A protein has these predicted regions:
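Single conserved hydrophobic/aromatic residue that forms the stacking wall/gate
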Residues: 1-13, 199-204
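Acidic active-site catalytic centers that drive phospho-/nucleotidyl reactions
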Residues: 55, 87-89, 172, 202
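Active-site metal-binding motif and surrounding structural segment of the metallo-beta-lactamase
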Residues: 49, 60-107
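Short catalytic-loop micro-motif centered on adjacent basic/acidic residues
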Residues: 52-55, 80-83, 146
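Metallo-beta-lactamase
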Residues: 14, 108-202
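Conserved beta-strand hairpin/beta-sheet module of binuclear metal-dependent hydrolase folds
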Residues: 16-69, 159-162, 166-170
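Active-site environment of divalent metal-dependent phosphoester hydrolases
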Residues: 88-91, 113-115, 153-154, 175-178
């Protein structure tokens, strides 16, 4: 549910590595949407002079997600965790990864941090990087530009555009239900995804 990743743990444009996890055991996404082909929890690592983790994953796949993260990092440690929004399938492991890497900074917008205390008991004093529309974060060769996208489909949603490889990390803005290795009618599922998750959150 972001930029289209390669299958498994592979490079997505040079040094942008997919560390997400397929979940084929789930029957209902968010306890309401039927997902006969499961879902994918999409997460990435951008490897550069500075390392950024782009979202985490659902608590259902914590162990596998951490294994993918550690494989991608090797002997390095992340500098940033970029939080697109706090929906559990993107954000459930924020506290665990913040505790695992105590020097890592957390990147979000003002609404992100206003809401975070409702989900996690975590002290982010001196660890918050608060961004707004158009702000930039340099990782070295890669640079992220932040685009606010409230109510797509949570109030604090933001997207990130990486200008070197021209990749948009679109949070829940584009995509479909279904695990990545499922062969299905992409157009039909993308339409259902839009009307279930996005259409109801837009302006009347």
């Amino acid at each position: 549910r972001d930029v289209a990743p390669s299958r498994g743990l592979g490079d997505v444009y040079k040094r942008q590595i997919y560390i997400g996890v397929d979940d084929k055991d789930i029957d209902l996404f968010e306890s309401q949407y039927v997902v006969p082909n499961g879902v994918s929890y999409n997460s990435y690592v951008i490897m550069d002079d500075k390392i950024a983790i782009m979202d985490t994953a659902d608590a259902r796949v914590t162990d596998k997600w951490f294994a993918n993260l550690r494989e991608a990092l090797g002997d390095r440690k992340p500098d940033y965790l970029v939080v697109s929004h706090l929906e559990p399938d993107h954000a459930s492991n924020i506290q665990k990864v913040a505790e695992a890497y105590p020097d890592m900074q957390i990147v979000g917008n003002a609404k992100t941090f206003n809401m975070m205390g409702q989900f996690f008991d975590i002290d982010l004093t001196d660890r918050k990087v608060v961004v707004a529309e158009g702000d930039k974060l340099s990782l070295g060769k890669h640079e992220l530009t932040f685009v606010m996208a409230p109510m797509v489909h949570w109030p604090e949603v933001m997207m990130e555009y990486e200008s070197t490889d021209k990749v948009l990390f679109s949070a829940d803005g584009f995509g479909k239900f279904g695990a990545l290795d499922t062969d299905e009618d992409w157009t039909c599922e993308a339409r259902r995804y839009y009307f279930c998750l996005l259409y109801t959150s837009g302006a009347a």
